Amino acid sequence: ANLVGTEQFMKWVYKNPDGINKVLEVTREAAVAAENFAFDNGADYYVFAEPTAGPALLRPKFFEKFLVPVLKDVVDRAKGPVVLHVCGNSDGVIDMMCDTGVAGISIEEKADMKADVEIAHAKGVKVFGNVATATTLFSGTPEEVYQEATQALENGTDFVCPGCGIAPPSPLENLLQIKKARDDYFSKS
């Protein structure tokens, strides 16, 4: 969507599907080049972030129609494992995200971790997330981060981590609470 602008992209979903397919063809090849460059240079896995593909902006039927075929191809051509992140509450597309062949999905705090883990694990897909990036990690207390990370683990996340990126000025102490929660959780298991 960034190539033509989010608003234009969303209009094209209805009015210019051929334009959508042309944009996605360009991004498909760029995505394959980027992921394999990373793998050729030692990456263990590659994360694709889809900021405009979530149900808040794109209906699930259009996610399935336009994005799933492209994502499947990008994942198939990857030289290593791929994780797919869809911003916002991605509950409406979790099943489709898992059907792209990814090794993992990354979900935000808005998504239902328990339900999404159940869907993903049934398909052999790992789940990453879902400590809130802005409200908890960036502006919350260390105790809040610890509590939210522990909750994500209790809800079944395979990899406890921020639900989205990490804001550069996030307090280091808050970031360390994710590790502490993980260590404490698994020392009790």
Language-model region placement:
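Active-site loop segments of alpha/beta catalytic cores
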Residues: 1-189
